[in-house]
């Protein structure tokens, strides 16, 4: 087959014809490594070196032709490099090829490339006139069949089809070879038609390093294909025999950290083998499994878990029965059952992180499935017994979880550099229902920060402990540009505290991000670091924004906007609750803070107790339609803007009495509204005073709305003490109202109970309180309301500021 070898001293003319489209791009690196570089070494007599030159005419000449498809117009169909005698320079030409275009084409312009190659051989013939006969080789590297079109760009061979050109190549004694990542019948036909005249070829050798490659060679020698001759690839027998060796029971009984790691290297190498078919591999695995079952009686409880295909759906059923108490309350059992497709890929090893965080129970099953994914098992064997046999010993479960996390995270950090090591601390709400809502549970985990090689991150000034605060990821959607302009590091956590690690996975996987704030006392360039969890890659990534000040301001603005939205939602819920109260048969609630307007008297303590019992309508109350009409009449006359002088005018017309909204008929209880002023009633109230007050309302005052409530309070404070009796109830101020100087604040927070807070007490001398004297209603719209803020957001905002 090979007419010349490097030791014979025969000079060669070599032309590489390569398809320069994106169809070949993904495969070119593999073809270059396994076939092109060995071919160059064959013609060069050794590896290419920068100082190797065979002379302009005396040594081996290399030339490169790159052809495309018809979609490359208006560019030329072919790019040609002039011949060179330097193998090193030729390799640089190969590395500079840009594989692009051809995505919408199923064929390529092979005829254009071969016609240009024939022109190059014509030029070689003129250059070699003084040397004589040379060894001529044309190598075609492509991944698509040829167009049924003749060559058009070549001047000498214009009009020749691809078959005509390969026949021309064979007639001129040029050895034609084809290297393709796919077995294409059209290319094999070209190889057969390019056979030199009068040459009887022996049985071709198999040079393919991958069973999918088609390697048809003439005129040169390549390394023989197969897994045994490729450096770094283990023989097939070692691939098949190693996966069944690690078994879970020895790991549980002994040290699991020494048994589990050998599973991964042979499993990662299984896709590299190319000589055994899947059927042979499965048969060999079945034989090995039978031997292990015979030698180790304890394995019979675990062998049913080795078949991921037919029994995978049945594995999920026992998980909900006996091992359920070992899972966290929010564990998602379906996540523990991997799909058959994920078990057959090496990338599925990283999915063990999710399995450990959701619960350590089913972990041995997944380990066995990954260790030997091709071992068949009779369907009649009980799956439930297998799972129960593995999970019965409770002390063994933390050991299995302890083994899995480092093994799954170690490959991620294999090519990264350790930049910082310390402790990460955060707070989360306890999962117990009986615990106070404001209670916080502090957790911490040892962690390491890794960076990519070549990155420069100064961590020598970082504190030993990083404090992380949780923030919902939905609040960070507006900070996308700041996230994109950031550096990325990787966090790796040590699983010394398995409970804290599971809690971190649970929180970060449920829509929260970690805001790591560096204190100002630390002399480092980083102030804020965002910790995010990638559920797709199963890793924790840290984003360090380049614009630190802009990022801090952005988070501050996001939190401010979020609080404003929350306040608006709370106000809307209050209004909706008032409307729903009317529809349910309760006394209509005035959303603007008015007092109730039904005539009658009722002690304050009884009114408060009725209010806390759901605001039920008492016997003898007016109908809902009448109350609604009174509400509408009050709104129409704008009682929010009563002048300061109104109480004085009313005092001249009627004796001291209760306000218009609190006058009720005898025997009719009052149902106060939350946020209204509660005060004792005047026994001498006139039932017909309401109509008098509504008919004599003066026009709107020019006093600003925001100042009117204060005028009312000042006017009432001047005449409070003479009207307040020893047995009267002290007044209640609505939540959220401002407190006057010297005024005692008597309101309750929403989280407190009213039960024992309404005892009667004597007035405190020197203290100004809201009296029961005649005055207008006290509106709430002009008073400032302060909404309680969540503890988590306050902590974040305080630390960021």
Swiss-Prot record:
Q: Name one GO biological process term.
A: positive regulation of transcription by RNA polymerase II
Q: Where is this motif: LXXLL motif?
A: 689-693
Alphabetical list of Gene3D superfamilies matching this protein = Mediator complex subunit 25, ACID domain
Per the record, which residues fall in region Disordered?
647-735
Q: Which keywords does the record carry? A: Activator, Nucleus, Transcription, Transcription regulation
Task: Tell me a GO cellular component.
Answer: mediator complex
Signal sequence range? none
**PROSITE patterns recorded:** VWFA
Q: Which family does it belong to?
A: Belongs to the Mediator complex subunit 25 family.
**PANTHER family assigned to the protein according to its UniProt record, in alphabetical order:** MEDIATOR OF RNA POLYMERASE II TRANSCRIPTION SUBUNIT 25
Biological function: Component of the Mediator complex, a coactivator involved in the regulated transcription of nearly all RNA polymerase II-dependent genes. Mediator functions as a bridge to convey information from gene-specific regulatory proteins to the basal RNA polymerase II transcription machinery. Mediator is recruited to promoters by direct interactions with regulatory proteins and serves as a scaffold for the assembly of a functional preinitiation complex with RNA polymerase II and the general transcription factors.
Spell out the protein name for this chain.
Mediator of RNA polymerase II transcription subunit 25
Organism of origin: Xenopus laevis (African clawed frog)
The protein's gene is named med25
